[in-house]
Amino acid sequence: MWRLKVGAESVGEEDEKWVKSVSNHLGRQVWEFCADAAADTPHQLLQIQNARNHFHHNRFHRKQSSDLFLAIQYEKEIAKGAKGGAVKVKEGEEVGKEAVKSTLERALGFYSAVQTRDGNWASDLGGPLFLLPGLVIALHVTGVLNSVLSKHHRVEMCRYLYNHQNEDGGWGLHIEGTSTMFGSALNYVALRLLGEDADGGDGGAMTKARAWILERGGATAITSWGKLWLSVLGVYEWSGNNPLPPEFWLLPYSLPFHPGRMWCHCRMVYLPMSYLYGKRFVGPITPKVLSLRQELYTIPYHEIDWNKSRNTCAKEDLYYPHPKMQDILWGSIYHVYEPLFTRWPGKRLREKALQAAMKHIHYEDENSRYICLGPVNKVLNMLCCWVEDPYSDAFKLHLQRVHDYLWVAEDGMRMQGYNGSQLWDTAFSIQAIVATKLVDSYAPTLRKAHDFVKDSQIQEDCPGDPNVWFRHIHKGAWPLSTRDHGWLISDCTAEGLKASLMLSKLPSTMVGEPLEKNRLCDAVNVLLSLQNDNGGFASYELTRSYPWLELINPAETFGDIVIDYPYVECTAATMEALTLFKKLHPGHRTKEIDTAIGKAANFLEKMQRADGSWYGCWGVCFTYAGWFGIKGLVAAGRTYNSCLAIRKACEFLLSKELPGGGWGESYLSCQNKVYTNLEGNKPHLVNTAWVLMALIEAGQGERDPAPLHRAARLLMNSQLENGDFVQQEIMGVFNKNCMITYAAYRNIFPIWALGEYCHRVLTE
């Protein structure tokens, strides 16, 4: 049976040397297979098999797992926290305050039971389907696939890939997406490397997958990221890639297209890609690689026109088509520049550029304890370290962090989009629990969560000259996941600060000692340093270049990736945090804070669309951004009566209410930038909770509470008997077009919204 190990228990004595930490591994989460049959009860084993069977049977209709393995592991704790049967409110029946409190008590009973001993909440952060294949290819090429991934890991990975294969035989960019060449070719290759036969899988799954690929022209039509991975494996030629010259890292920073000016995820992915491209690295040409060369293409491998293939992309993948200017640019570099730097004397500059790239790779690895910014650059950096020296400590240190990214549930094992969302979920959870006013009953839960937030704050800046490594100040910030990860994010810092400030208002005998004021001030300092001239806040750093740089975005699959844009969500979260800080600590940098909030409010108003909506870049989508937009403006002192933007936002959200109450927004809203209901006009608990809180914040209860009552009824009626809430469609997004699961949202936001509803809308 699989068991989740968290924190220090996730590191064995023999691994301690190779798993670096600045926080005693706080928040680390690793799934391990327990081979001790005596540790598993027949009841648990039956539950696991039933969960797997149920997911597989419904896989084409319900793409999200419900993290049932985690619930089975915490079964005893959940039973202890049980508070009786769920309350159901009939249509037309008045929602009573006691009924809401009863629902909240059951919800918190369940949610407290699944809190880890470290104080955070572990949950699935999967969804993208292009991550696992990159890991499998890298481990295969370096010859460590079967030593890093046990037989049980490989079985679960195959289960996951088969479970998320679409009915047409292909795979999407993410688990709810339609089939793409990027997803289909890479996942087909991953299954072959994991040991599946070319005609294996139930119901001819591999045959169907191959047919999907070949019917659309074969793997030459894969996206640029896919071309790189296939080149590394040896089933695609480097001459079929558009150039990724590492010499970009030698250019002066004053140039607007210097990599240091790009969004950190963009530069950190293209950094190792440029190293591999500059090296033209290819793994061992094995019989399986030779077989894949035959399986993936419609013509013999040696007859493929690789130059033509550079700009070939399947129509199913083409979210961001290359502008003509970009094709001319890459063509010029390909035909003129690259030949000069692959032979003497230009090769000397290429070697210098490769050395510079590796210095940046090693800096990123060491500064993140080999977790790295995200899963893509994690695997690419690991591969680069092996290419540089297969026996290096750097490569060994990387291998020990692979499992930080793996998550298993009833649908199988995936690679997550980060090493978790531990801090993010915990900061939200604290605010949700505080909103219920059931603090007395759940003080131990809050105390553990409080400790986690305090210990997760980044307490030092990155070493060395930040200008050399293109880093922002970090001291006082919070990450999305763990302190060991080490990368600040603006809205994570804001939510961490808000949670800390809220708990500072409660008795320390209940929730622990508050965070020291100097550390609160450090967080404020980081937030103030992140505001752009237009008043908005980007995600990780200041916006360092111009939107026109998107013209050279080479990733056909993703939008708006080249620079770090200011976001509605990051801006609004920061406004809330600064407002609360000013209220509790009025003497610290008050004038600067007031100025920052005023500029941010103006930014939010400018970002609002004509119909009253805001486009959400990190959640689905208009409901998510609407919640943040309204909260941010209210934090700035605006009201429904005084602010046209708030009135328009409320009108927009109310216009999207479903006939039976609630809201249900599809991920297609993100992709197409047009509000789109879920298929069948189904309501979604998380969208409904976001809108319920947004409308409460804007004073809807004083004008017409009927939509609020309908939303609350929907949330209450969706609670399961054990206090959990049902897992529905995907709610996270990045880069406009790729979705990501935040499994804890199904608990956090219904609890938070019902808490706000209970105490701000209902009367005694």
From Swiss-Prot:
Changing residue 488 to P: No change of product-specificity. No change of product-specificity. One of its GO terms (molecular function) is cucurbitadienol synthase activity. The keyword Repeat applies. InterPro entries: SQ_cyclase_C (IPR032696), SQ_cyclase_N (IPR032697), Squalene_cyclase (IPR018333), Terpene_synthase_CS (IPR002365), Terpenoid_cyclase/PrenylTrfase (IPR008930). The active site is at residue 491. It catalyses: (S)-2,3-epoxysqualene = cucurbitadienol. GO terms for biological process: triterpenoid biosynthetic process. Its EC number is 5.4.99.33. It is an enzyme of class 5 (isomerase). SUPFAM superfamilies: Terpenoid cyclases/Protein prenyltransferases. GO terms for cellular component: lipid droplet. The keyword Cell membrane does not apply. Keywords: Isomerase, Repeat. PFTB repeats lie at residues 104-146, 154-195, 520-565, 597-637, 646-687. Belongs to the terpene cyclase/mutase family. NCBIfam families: squalene_cyclas. PANTHER family: TERPENE CYCLASE/MUTASE FAMILY MEMBER, TERPENE CYCLASE_MUTASE FAMILY MEMBER. Oxidosqualene cyclase involved in the biosynthesis of the highly oxygenated tetracyclic triterpenes cucurbitacins. Converts oxidosqualene to cucurbitadienol and does not produce lanosterol. This is Cucurbitadienol synthase. The gene is CPQ.
